[in-house]
Amino acid sequence: MDVIPAIDLLEGRCVRLYQGDYDRSQVFSENPVDVAKQWVDEGATRLHIVDLDGAKAGKVVNLGAIEAIAQAISIPIEIGGGLRDRSSVEQVFNLGVQWAILGTVAVEQPQLVQELCQQYPGQIIIGIDARNGLVATRGWLETSEVLATQLAVQMQEMGAAAIIYTDIHRDGTLAGPNLDALRELAAAISIPVIASGGVSSVTDLLSLLALEPQGVTGVIVGRALYTGDINLKEALQAIGPGRIQDIPPNLDFSSFA
């Protein structure tokens, strides 16, 4: 399972929000590039970046920071926040980003999503941010009447590469992932589901690993990495591609003699 560190950008700095509340942000670093390099050094194979200013403004705002990160590291990057038109998506791909995460437009302009999926096959991910099972939009400032599972099925039909599912009530809280919601979503679609929100411990990661056979292929970890509740190297050893339980046991009992 992929363990994907998150970098949330607000005014060019690396921050974490509590339940998506912009008034409850905590700055973890003034230099997002250094943070990105740290996660790469600790074994990350993919990076999740959110332009929080962009999510609010409806257009990409932290272009400079995103470009600097993309140039500084060699692992693939996915980016979301403010990607609500074709030019914004083209803009981030031109910076060297591998995946664009679309959220609000999935609800408001599904036809555009379909066109982008055709233009960039395998590179469009849908971010479904849910509050009590309903999809939130516009930087989580609005809640729609659309069910998360309903949108996931529609986006799969449009050609989306994967779904990132965030439970807003748990995001930034270290309260643990919403396993029931993830199970329900993964059962409804056949494309990969990436979990996000609430992960606080290796125990949480192992509980998500149990959902891997059902289609939950990755987990985005944010606050817990920054507070030290989760060590990235240990997380990768626990559930990553080369995890300890995937290594065949040494059955040479002579070593115990």
Swiss-Prot record:
GO CC annotation: cytoplasm
EC category name: isomerase
GO MF assignments: 1-(5-phosphoribosyl)-5-[(5-phosphoribosylamino)methylideneamino]imidazole-4-carboxamide isomerase activity
Subcellular compartments: Cytoplasm
Location (main, coarse): cytoplasm
Record's keyword terms, sorted: Amino-acid biosynthesis, Cytoplasm, Histidine biosynthesis, Isomerase
Pfam families: His_biosynth
Xref: Gene3D superfamilies: Aldolase class I
Residues at the active site: 8, 129
Catalytic activities: 1-(5-phospho-beta-D-ribosyl)-5-[(5-phospho-beta-D-ribosylamino)methylideneamino]imidazole-4-carboxamide = 5-[(5-phospho-1-deoxy-D-ribulos-1-ylimino)methylamino]-1-(5-phospho-beta-D-ribosyl)imidazole-4-carboxamide
Domain of life: Bacteria
EC number: 5.3.1.16
Pathway membership, UniProt: Amino-acid biosynthesis; L-histidine biosynthesis; L-histidine from 5-phospho-alpha-D-ribose 1-diphosphate: step 4/9
Coiled-coil residues: none
GO BP annotation list: L-histidine biosynthetic process; L-tryptophan biosynthetic process
HAMAP family assigned: HisA (MF_01014)
PANTHER family with a match to the protein in the record: 1-(5-PHOSPHORIBOSYL)-5-[(5-PHOSPHORIBOSYLAMINO)METHYLIDENEAMINO] IMIDAZOLE-4-CARBOXAMIDE ISOMERASE
Family: Belongs to the HisA/HisF family.
Protein name per UniProt: 1-(5-phosphoribosyl)-5-[(5-phosphoribosylamino)methylideneamino] imidazole-4-carboxamide isomerase
Species in which this protein is naturally found: Trichormus variabilis (strain ATCC 29413 / PCC 7937) (Anabaena variabilis)
Encoding gene (name): hisA
